[in-house]
Design a protein with these regions (language model features):
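Short glycine-/small-residue motifs
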Residues: 124-127
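Conserved active-site tyrosine of GNAT-family acetyltransferases
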Residues: 19-24, 94, 119-122
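Conserved glycine-rich acetyl-CoA-binding loop
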Residues: 14, 18, 84-85
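Vicinal oxygen chelate
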Residues: 1-8, 30-118, 130-133
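Conserved beta-strand-loop-alpha-helix junction that forms the acyl-donor binding cleft
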Residues: 13-15, 109-110
Length: 133
């Protein structure tokens, strides 16, 4: 048995509602968030993202943080899709739902088709596939 199981990513948001709307519409996450509580849990299959407002977190831990301006180049969320064509399709779907384009779909020398978008808080999201069909 493992000492730890890594199954959740936590994101500190400027606006929980905007972030919930983005992830539910763009990627199909589900949530039973009531729109009032500061803590939001969203799931997609076995993946879980927890959202918490930045200001509420700072109040909880009694300290201020500096957040990246624009795109957050310190981490990414990576989503695999079945085929190269799906990368292109999901990239357009993300843009339609408010994502900012960072890198349009590109086939990399190592054989992956990938693209990058950013969510409303500037977090980088990779959508990629290694299957060219």
């Amino acid at each position: 048995m493992n000492r730890f199981n890594f199954n959740t990513v936590g994101l500190f948001t400027r606006d929980n509602k905007a972030t919930v709307d983005f992830y539910t519409k763009t990627f199909g996450f589900t949530t039973d968030w009531d729109g009032i509580q500061p803590n939001v849990e969203m799931t997609l299959g076995d993946m879980r993202i927890i959202l918490f407002p930045r200001d509420a977190f700072e109040q909880m831990v009694s300290r201020k943080f500096q957040y990246p301006e624009g795109f957050n180049g310190t981490m990414e969320l990576a989503f695999d899709v079945p085929t190269f064509a799906d990368v292109d399709k999901e990239y357009q779907h993300a843009l339609t739902n408010g994502a900012a384009s960072v890198l349009p779909p590109t086939t990399e020398p190592w054989g992956q088709r990938t693209c990058y978008v950013a969510d409303p808080d500037g977090n980088l999201i990779e959508i990629g596939s290694f299957i060219d069909k």
